[in-house]
């Protein structure tokens, strides 16, 4: 069975098709990236760390579902830190953890496939979620975000769901629920529910004007940016 290095990060979930730049400065994870480069290991598993958790106890401090990511690029800095870019693939279960031989953790590859159902039902569910997302964007994003959303929106339904989940402003624990959803339809419906709740809770006086405002996200593409344990700055889908 294949093994992947495990990278626990606070405030960070990775969905299929999502790209994520990471700054690696902690010694054990610098070693992890060096080993990946030396051994031509192009995949790592990223999992959400629980709030205020002791990362040294990885089984208690992380969620049981994470994501396998491909390392797209690695850039080493003169001080030995790294900038890397990863791309979300399939989700996985965090099972047996191994740290006997390395300063970082590794896990066995245990895929956790997302259930797929009737394509027509999935398509209709995606349309509904996208309509709600457009409403959500009008309330919470800058005035020109809708155009950028339409330009960046993927065609594949799985990636459309990832695009929505990565862009809505929700706590990491709720985003984790989206990642763990049993099926694509469940993921889309729960994302729609979260967006609808936030739209309905929004005060009318807080609605953005027709002009750009510093209080709103500048573009849809950075709406889910977050800073994680290694100063990770989350970007969205290609």
Model regions and ranges:
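N-terminal low-complexity, acidic/polar interaction/targeting segments
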Residues: 1-238
């Amino acid at each position: 069975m294949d093994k992947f290095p495990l990278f626990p990060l606070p405030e960070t979930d990775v969905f299929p098709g999502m790209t994520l730049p990471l700054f690696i400065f902690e010694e054990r994870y610098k070693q992890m990236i060096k080993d990946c480069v030396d051994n031509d290991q192009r995949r790592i598993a990223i999992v959400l760390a629980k709030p205020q958790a002791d990362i040294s106890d990885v089984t208690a401090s992380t969620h049981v579902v994470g994501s396998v990511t491909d390392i797209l690029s690695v850039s080493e800095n003169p001080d030995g830190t790294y900038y890397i870019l990863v791309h979300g693939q399939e989700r996985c279960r965090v099972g047996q953890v191994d740290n006997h031989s390395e300063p970082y953790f590794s896990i066995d590859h245990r895929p956790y496939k997302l259930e797929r159902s009737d394509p027509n039902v999935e398509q209709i569910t995606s349309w509904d979620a996208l309509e709600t997302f457009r409403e959500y964007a009008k309330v919470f994003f800058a005035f020109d975000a809708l155009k950028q959303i339409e330009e960046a929106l993927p065609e594949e339904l799985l990636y459309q769901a990832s695009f929505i989940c990565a862009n809505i402003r929700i706590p990491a624990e709720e985003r984790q629920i989206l990642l763990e959803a049993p099926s694509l339809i469940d993921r889309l419906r729960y994302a729609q529910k979260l967006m609808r709740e936030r739209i309905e809770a929004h005060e009318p006086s807080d609605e953005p004007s027709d002009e750009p405002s510093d209080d709103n996200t500048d573009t849809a593409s950075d709406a889910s940016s977050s800073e994680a344990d290694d100063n990770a700055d989350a970007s969205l889908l290609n």
